UniProtKB/Swiss-Prot annotation:
The gene is rpl30e. GO terms for cellular component: cytosolic large ribosomal subunit. It comes from the Archaea. Pfam families: Ribosomal_L7Ae. This is Large ribosomal subunit protein eL30. GO terms for biological process: translation.
């Protein structure tokens, strides 16, 4: 699976929430099926994520700049939540983890 292509497809055809505050709200509402964080995501947010049981977290190997580019955005993205994958196979990462 090409992660970047799957992520772009999820953004195009599904429901993906970008940004730390919006992701946190989405998690608290129980809508997030998966959370993706950049390698340089702030440590305090990472530790907050650890308190949520049954939340699948995927660490993107690049920086927030690289994650933004992978999303097709011209800005940094430190974290995002997959609410609905649409036509993407991105949730298959949960099965391989």
């Amino acid at each position: 699976m090409d992660f970047n292509a799957s992520l772009r497809r999820a953004i195009k055809t599904g429901d993906v929430i970008l940004g730390q505050n919006n992701t946190e709200k989405c998690i608290k509402e129980g809508k997030a099926q998966m959370v993706v964080i950049a390698a340089n995501c702030p440590e305090n947010f990472r530790s907050q994520l650890g308190s949520y049981e049954n939340l699948f977290i995927h660490t993107f190997e690049g920086s927030s700049v690289a994650l933004g580019k992978a999303c097709g955005k011209p800005f940094m993205v430190s974290t995002l939540a997959i609410v609905s994958p649409g036509e993407s196979d991105i949730l298959s990462l949960k099965r391989t983890a």
